[in-house]
Amino acid sequence: LLLRLIVLSLISSILLAACSEQAGERRTYVLTTGTTGGTFYPVGVALSTLVSAQEDAGFSLTAISSAGSMENIKLMRDNQAQFALILGIFGAWAFDGSGPIRNPYEDFRSISAMWPNVEHFVLRSDLVTDGTIADLSNLAGERYSIGMRNSGAEQTGFYIFDALGIDYSNELSIAYMGY
């Protein structure tokens, strides 16, 4: 039911944009997703397949892979994509021009919330002392994979480290790896 509502919301939003196109033309829009190993990519491919199957809609949607939320906002700002899957916090940062996003993107709009996001920090057992978020301070001097450059994982990870007072740029050896 949730997927059906999301698809209907997406189709309705795109229909409004497609109404200005000449009759008989099938316009193609780009939906930027995330890495092929993450969750955004298969969800984006499924959405584009469902939308594109609606032949009477007058448009189609092509899903492309990317580094994730941060790159997706840049691709939309540069008009290389018309739709994007992003983490909710990135939507707020993009609209306000806050966090890692320098300039407000005031024409940025949300169509639908997809699912709540949960951050996972995986540590070796020898770095876990009490099983709480305080264990992240045990990472000092360690190599830590934060995700891909320009990804949501990278930026939200840095945001959380900052909030916890962890100086990741000096205390950790950051590695940029995908899922």
Placement of each model-derived feature along the sequence:
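C-terminal motif of bacterial Sec signal peptides marking the signal peptidase cleavage site
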Residues: 15-18
